A protein has these predicted regions:
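A short acidic, helix-capping loop that chelates divalent metal ions and anchors anionic groups
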Residues: 32-36, 122-129, 190-194
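Canonical Radical SAM [4Fe-4S] cluster-binding loop centered on the CxxxCxxC motif
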Residues: 4-43, 55
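Glycine-centered loop/turn positions within well-structured domains
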Residues: 22, 123-124, 254
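Short, conserved loop/turn and helix-capping segments at secondary-structure boundaries
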Residues: 40-43, 132, 197-200, 204
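Radical SAM/AdoMet-radical enzyme domain recognition
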Residues: 43-63, 70-184
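Accessory C-terminal segments flanking Radical SAM cores
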Residues: 190-264
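Short, conserved beta-strand edge motifs with alternating hydrophobic and charged residues
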Residues: 155, 182-185, 233, 246-248
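Active-site phosphate/pyrophosphate- and oxyanion-stabilizing loops and adjacent acidic/basic residues
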Residues: 14, 79, 168, 204, ...
């Protein structure tokens, strides 16, 4: 399927809810209004959408929110989606707070991957930016995902003055775990949310800082299935790392021309 800009669209990003159990300062203003329940797509309608998208060439589906596990019946929806499409690449983006009880179900249905958002390894700062004291639960669920063998990527919004001092901790996590740790440039998300130039930490500056910690080698980007992240392997004094570093640069280096996603 090609759009009006002749981009090859084969990836569906489907938001199952706009509701979330966290109140991240860069995402939520605290004054938001939610879509009325009767106006939100029913799961049956989403299943029909996926069917139609696959008929048009979509090969990969990512389910997002809000927080998808905050919507009742989401795990059951994933089970039905997998049963209907055994070969479909199905992924989920989550904040990691509510996924725990569903991990064995996700393993059983063969969920392809999880993107998990975590901006800090500090409990106090986690509560500061999310408004919730759930850091321990997220770390517990990260370990459970690793134990279950479900591939996941760790996404962190990079912010000067907030988590730039934690770069060594993020790099160390990537060195010792077989996952991609990806930094996303801080960008404006809407009226009333926290954003300023002083907090912006560009992808090139992050990469320079990482090079002061470990050796990095760029990974050749996939032409068809590659996402917006530029990936790097890592090596330290004790040898190569188990994971990789990713940089996503919506502000300093736009990737819209290569976008392969339909967002609903």
């Amino acid at each position: 399927m090609f759009d009006s800009c002749r981009r090859d669209i084969h990836y569906l990003r489907l938001s199952v809810t706009d509701r979330c159990n966290l109140r991240c300062t860069y995402c939520r203003s605290g004054m938001e209004t939610f879509i009325p329940h009767e106006s939100v797509l029913r799961y049956e309608e989403m299943e029909q959408l996926v069917d139609m998208a696959m008929d048009m060439g979509v090969e990969k589906v990512r389910l997002t929110g809000g927080e998808p596990f905050a919507r009742k019946g989401f795990a059951d929806f994933l089970e039905r989606l997998r049963a209907a499409h055994p070969a479909l690449d199905i992924r989920v983006t989550t904040n990691g707070t509510l996924i725990g009880p569903h991990i064995q179900t996700l393993k059983a249905i063969g969920l392809n991957a999880v993107n998990l958002s975590l901006d800090t390894f500090d409990r106090d700062k986690f509560e500061q930016i999310t408004g919730r004291d759930l850091f321990g639960k997220v770390r517990e669920n990260m370990d459970a995902l690793l134990d279950a063998g479900i591939p996941f990527k760790l996404n962190a919004v990079a912010m000067r003055g907030f988590n730039d001092d934690e770069l060594p901790a993020f790099v160390d996590y990537a060195m010792h775990h077989p996952i991609d740790v990806r930094f996303i440039e801080f960008m404006p998300m809407g009226e009333g949310t926290r954003w300023s130039d002083s907090c912006f930490w560009s992808a090139p500056d992050i990469l320079d800082a990482v090079k002061g910690l470990v050796a990095v080698v760029p990974v050749e980007q996939e032409q068809r299935n590659g996402g917006p992240a530029r990936l790097y392997t890592l090596s330290g004094p004790d040898g190569p790392g188990l994971g990789r570093l990713g940089l996503i640069s919506p502000l300093s280096s736009h990737f819209c021309t290569s976008c392969n996603r339909l967002r609903i």
